[in-house]
Regions:
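Gly/Ala-rich beta-loop-alpha elbow adjacent to hydrolase catalytic centers
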Residues: 78-82, 86
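Flexible "cap/lid" loop of the alpha/beta hydrolase fold
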Residues: 91-92, 96-139, 178
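Conserved serine/cysteine hydrolase catalytic core
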Residues: 173-217, 222-237
Length: 256
């Protein structure tokens, strides 16, 4: 059967194409590894209303893409905002199909709370207020969720000029409703191993918040640190590719 497939789920304000630099490296290092990158609804070629979006709808969309690709054995990776989506995908697919869940600098609220609750102090109140207002006025969040100059500061520190251009060009509008919806991870199977990739120079999700999110998840079996910014798939594609390939190889089934 060989290697399990690798499913990559993007975070907020971006689409499936943000993984391209890392996928290019994976194709060189492990050409037999099947990789599926999914667009969440309202991104890329995937239709969807960002204003009325809900977590269950996004979970169903990812599961549908996995089913359409006929993937029965996989490792799933969620970046950033995918911390509210990927656990639901794992719950639906179960431990029989998911070998491991990897969360990279993800935002994981305490069960029963919302993504905005992961923000510190007054920022949480402001983010909730802004998201509610945007839902009421049927306005999606601006590309990347931030003005360009701030997005460059928050997402792109330490990048080369080419990496910054790629990142900012790929930013897109985000759903305000997802930000304030409460999560429910009550059915997530404990049998699926959990790995966390912690970004040490992250200005979007600080190390402190990441550790709080790990605790909210109930802990992880493996913690891998990378000295880079939030968009690690762009800033450190070689290192991330090596990590993801290594995790998949742990579950390789030798052909007779």
């Amino acid at each position: 059967m060989g290697l399990p497939a690798l499913v990559l789920v993007h975070g907020g304000g971006f689409a499936a194409d943000c993984w391209e630099p890392t996928i290019d490296v994976i194709r060189i290092l492990e050409p037999e590894l099947k990789v599926l990158t999914v667009d969440l609804p309202g991104r890329g070629n995937k239709g969807g209303d960002l204003i009325t979006a809900c977590i269950d709808g996004w979970v169903d969309s990812v599961v549908s893409d996995i089913e359409n690709a006929a993937l029965d054995d996989l490792v799933i990776v969620g970046h950033s905002l995918a911390g509210v989506t990927v656990p639901g995908v794992v719950t639906k697919l179960g431990s029989a199909r998911v070998r491991e869940m990897i969360l990279a600098t993800a935002q994981v609220p305490t069960n029963g709370s919302a993504l905005v609750d992961t923000f510190p102090g007054a920022l949480s109140w402001y983010a909730r207020r802004t998201a509610k207002r945007n839902v009421q006025k049927s306005r999606s969040l601006r590309p990347g969720g931030l003005p360009t100059a701030l997005a460059r500061f928050v997402f792109c520190n330490g990048m080369t000029p080419a990496q910054r251009r790629f990142t900012l060009a790929g930013s897109c509008q985000e759903s305000p409703s997802i930000m304030i919806e409460k999560v429910d991870r009550s059915g997530m199977p404990d049998e699926v191993p959990r790995t966390w990739i912690l970004t040490r120079r992250d200005r979007a999700v600080s190390m402190k918040i990441q550790r709080e999110c790990i605790a909210a998840l109930g802990g992880v079996q493996t913690l891998i640190e990378i000295d880079t910014c939030h968009m690690l798939m762009v800033s450190e594609p070689e290192r991330l590719a090596e990590i993801l390939i290594g995790r998949c190889r742990l579950y390789e089934q030798r052909r007779p």
